[in-house]
């Protein structure tokens, strides 16, 4: 299977969907290739309240509207895994597990995913009460109490934010502590953590599964072999100019795959 497009967008998250809307509306023949599900990581967010013009929605609803909008302008979508990119020539080729596709231009929009800490049960319970949290203070709006596990002797964030966390009556901070394991069957029921200095282990259990584990250990870019030949920084994020162009002609970057300070839906689009 081999087809020719004006532009191929790799990644069906907010950045890829926004690019598809604009490309398709400009009457470019557009293909969006997404490995897992259209919408990206934001689809597991039940409440989005900071997207301009939308008072409140879910991540799934927001990206579904983006997809429908792109489709209304003629964009095509393909659920497939992009395995290889050939970007040097005037005609670009994207090899997937469902065939090879050609285009005059390619937009890399694979995004970034939360970095895994490596405790037992992390992969099994991802998406079932797991999310990245920018700060513990935000969680106190919804939780009766928040316990923060810090691997080192202190926070590495700005002192003003750290002080606010330390003073908060709903937050307990445990330093030199690492999460070892979570589990419980269909839902999260227990967590085991260890003091890195003393080796003492603590098992926290709840009979009614009324707790969650929120992992915030930064992000890692998604790219791998697809970014071969493209300039990236030391962490693997795509280097682009002010117009989102990469070091190769006809290849652009969009969204969280690119170097940026803030990773939100509104900055991705």
Which role fits each region the language model picked out?
Residues 48-52, 125-126, 164-167:
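Short, hinge-like loop/turn segments at secondary-structure boundaries
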Residues 3-73, 133-158, 174, 233:
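Beta1-alpha1 glycine-rich phosphate/pyrophosphate-binding loop at the start
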Residues 20-22, 44, 118-122, 137-138, ...:
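Short amphipathic alpha-helical segments
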Residues 113, 118, 123-130, 215-267:
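FAD-site-proximal beta/loop scaffold in flavoenzymes
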Residues 70-95, 101-103, 140-242:
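A Rossmann-like FAD-binding core segment of flavoenzymes
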Residues 4-6, 79-80, 176, 248:
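Phosphate-coordination loops involved in phosphoryl transfer and adenosine-cofactor binding
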């Amino acid at each position: 299977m081999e087809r020719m497009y004006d532009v191929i967008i790799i990644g069906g998250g907010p950045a890829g969907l926004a690019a598809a809307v604009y490309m398709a509306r400009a009457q470019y023949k557009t293909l969006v290739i997404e490995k897992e599900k259209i919408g990206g990581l934001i689809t597991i967010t039940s409440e989005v309240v900071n997207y301009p013009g939308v008072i409140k929605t879910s991540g799934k609803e927001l990206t579904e509207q983006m997809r429908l909008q792109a489709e209304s302008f003629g964009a095509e979508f393909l659920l497939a895994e992009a395995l290889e990119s050939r970007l040097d020539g005037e005609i670009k080729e994207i090899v997937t597990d469902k065939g090879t596709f050609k285009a005059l231009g390619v937009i890399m929009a694979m995004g970034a995913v939360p970095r895994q800490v490596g405790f037992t049960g992390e992969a099994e319970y991802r998406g079932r009460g797991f999310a990245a949290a920018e700060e513990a203070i935000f969680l106190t709006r919804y939780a009766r109490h928040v316990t923060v596990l810090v691997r080192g002797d202190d926070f590495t964030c700005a002192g003003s934010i750290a002080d606010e966390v330390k003073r908060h009556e709903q937050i307990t901070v445990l330093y030199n502590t690492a999460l070892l394991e979570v589990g419980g069957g269909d839902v999260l029921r227990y967590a085991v953590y260890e003091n890195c200095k003393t080796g003492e282990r603590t098992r926290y259990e709840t009979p009614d599964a009324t707790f969650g584990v929120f992992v915030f250990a930064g992000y890692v870019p998604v790219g791998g072999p697809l970014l071969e030949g493209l300039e990236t920084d030391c962490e693997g994020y795509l280097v682009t100019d002010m117009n989102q162009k990469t070091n190769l002609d006809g290849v652009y970057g969009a969204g969280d795959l690119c170097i940026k300070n803030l990773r939100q839906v509104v900055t991705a689009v």
